[in-house]
């Protein structure tokens, strides 16, 4: 009988904010045999790669390319915690795949809780210019590692919904490699993985899984990795109902990460059932955090309107 993954939260990282120093200490203390420093940031913070598994299918993943998107880092930390309690799942998975997981690609932005790096560069739009020291680390690893799949792990704002009512707690994308958005074999391989994730999670978070727009961006990471022939799966963690700390998102992001790796281990380049990808509803940008209805303005004439508010997430000094 196949054992199912039982979600566990990593107790060492209870909060949304993750200090780079705390993360580095944790990895060195607990996974010294699996981590390697692969580069450093503009402010000379280390960038670590965690390597697990000896399978033939090679997977590259990275978290916090945008410093204020910590859910993917949490997801991998939670998955490591789960594997402590369910080692058979770990052994089964990593007998088929080899995973290189780059933790916190943007440690400078992660420390300050900013999307961009210390030079105010959005690394997800830096593929052609290569202006950021950190992105050059990722690009070199991707181009020399002979990877079969890549996982580009991000978060999205609370504005996204699947149907105008439910939030898009998770969104996925197989990025296009051209303006025509041609569905190539490389894209189909990524779509097949996303389809497996969707089928396995849609009953747990019904109407909360969406498909991100596949508009082509010539300078973005996923689009160019697809052009290189690497099937790339974009993860976007979004809002979970009544949960601005994204604890629910964290849970299902972790499960989706595992399901994605498991799907890769089983598909091994197959495009089986890739068409299911088209059944996933597209993201819609229609949500706000708060809407004040029928607000009467203090004007010389009668003016009544609705005011929509979008929250801005900030980290306060002394809090994490």
Please name every model-derived segment.
Residues 52-53, 113-115, 224-230:
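Short glycine/proline-enriched loop/turn "hinge" motifs that connect secondary-structure elements
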Residues 43, 63-65:
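Single, functionally critical "micro-switch" positions that shape active/binding sites
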Residues 1-17, 145, 173-320:
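C-terminal accessory segments enriched in acidic
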Residues 1-47:
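Short glycine- and acidic-rich boundary segments immediately preceding or forming the N-terminal edge
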Residues 48-56:
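Short beta-strand-to-loop junctions in surface cap/lid or active-site-entrance loops
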Residues 56-58, 65, 70-207:
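Active-site/substrate-binding loop(s) of hydrolase catalytic cores
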């Amino acid at each position: 009988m196949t054992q199912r993954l039982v979600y566990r939260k990593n107790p060492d990282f209870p909060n949304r904010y993750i200090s780079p120093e705390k993360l580095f200490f944790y990895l060195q203390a607990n996974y010294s045999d699996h981590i390697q420093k692969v580069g450093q940031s503009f402010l000379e913070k280390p960038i670590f790669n965690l390597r697990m598994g000896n399978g033939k299918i090679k997977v590259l993943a990275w978290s916090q390319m945008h410093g204020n998107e910590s859910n993917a880092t949490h997801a991998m930390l939670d998955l490591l915690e789960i594997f402590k309690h369910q080692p058979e799942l770990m052994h089964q998975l990593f007998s088929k795949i080899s995973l290189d997981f780059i933790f916190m690609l943007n440690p400078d932005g992660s420390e300050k809780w900013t999307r961009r790096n210390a030079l105010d560069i959005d690394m997800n739009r830096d593929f052609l210019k290569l202006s950021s020291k950190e992105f050059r680390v990722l690009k070199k690893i991707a181009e020399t590692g002979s990877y079969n799949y890549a996982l580009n792990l991000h978060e999205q704002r609370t504005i996204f919904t699947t149907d105008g009512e439910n939030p898009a707690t998770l969104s996925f994308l197989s990025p296009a490699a051209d303006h025509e958005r041609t569905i190539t074999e490389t894209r189909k391989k990524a779509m097949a993985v996303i389809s497996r994730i969707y089928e396995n999670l849609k009953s747990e978070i019904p109407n909360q899984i969406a498909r991100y727009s596949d508009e082509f961006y010539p300078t973005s990471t996923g689009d160019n990795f697809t052009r290189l022939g690497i099937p790339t799966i974009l993860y976007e963690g979004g809002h979970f109902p009544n949960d601005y700390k994204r604890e629910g998102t964290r849970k299902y992001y972790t499960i989706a990460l595992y399901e994605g790796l498991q799907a890769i281990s089983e598909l091994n380049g197959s495009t089986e059932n890739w068409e299911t990808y088209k059944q996933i509803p597209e993201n819609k940008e229609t949500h706000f955090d708060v809407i004040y209805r029928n607000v009467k303005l203090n004007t010389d004439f009668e003016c009544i309107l609705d005011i929509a508010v979008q929250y801005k997430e900030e980290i306060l000094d002394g809090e994490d």
